[in-house]
A protein has these predicted regions:
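GNAT-family acyltransferases
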Residues: 1-107, 119-124, 128, 133, ...
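Glycine-rich acetyl-CoA-binding "A-motif" of GNAT/NAT acetyltransferases
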Residues: 76-79, 114, 144
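Conserved beta-strand-loop-alpha-helix junction that forms the acyl-donor binding cleft
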Residues: 136-146
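Conserved active-site tyrosine of GNAT-family acetyltransferases
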Residues: 149
């Protein structure tokens, strides 16, 4: 995965009705550790990382790189949105396209935050790199992620076996940002 391309980074914080998408900050470290160590979050992502390992290895201020947004609710991190160019993706249909990823703390599930944050990130992306398609990969067993992909307008490009499970690759064609 590499950078998005000719995008000014960081953008101004992106505000939605309930959320703010912003760059990671030092105050987010504990939430990142919680997110990466959560068995619930990583059910379909190969399992969580050991908390003690994360405590040792994670820098005081989480890494900042183009396409990495913290999802903030009332001043606290509840998740992360990732937009990264898939230069080395295993599937030809995804290679070179921007890949959408998202992780949310379990306490934030079921409130529509993922949908709200992803729509905002995709609208921002469509405004700064118009005409670019976006891909998303998830396990077909991850019902919530499959539902979110459909809600966001991703359509099936292919299914394939990887990581001992059936994977779903979706494509979202370029759209005009919503007003």
């Amino acid at each position: 995965m590499t950078e998005l391309g000719p995008v000014a980074w960081p953008p101004a914080p992106i505000r939605t009705e309930r959320l703010v998408l912003r760059e990671p900050e030092a105050r987010d470290r504990a939430a990142f550790i919680e997110l990466l160590a959560s068995p619930e979050v990583h059910t379909y992502l190969g399992g969580p990382r050991p908390r003690d390992e994360l405590e040792r290895e994670m820098p005081g201020a989480p890494e900042r790189w183009p396409g990495s947004f913290v999802v903030d609710l009332d001043g606290s991190m509840i998740g992360q949105i990732l937009l990264r160019r898939a230069t080395e993706h295993r599937r030809p249909a995804a290679a070179g396209k921007v890949d959408l990823g998202y992780l949310f703390l379990p306490r934030a599930w079921g409130f529509g935050y993922a949908s709200e944050a992803c729509v905002a990130a995709l609208d921002w992306f469509a405004a700064v790199l118009p005409g670019e398609p976006v891909v998303l990969t998830t396990q077909t067993a991850n019902v919530g992620s499959m539902r979110l992909a459909a809600k966001l307008g991703f359509t099936e490009a292919e299914r394939f076996q990887a990581w001992d499970a059936e994977q779903w690759l979706g494509l979202r064609s370029p759209v005009t940002p919503s007003a």
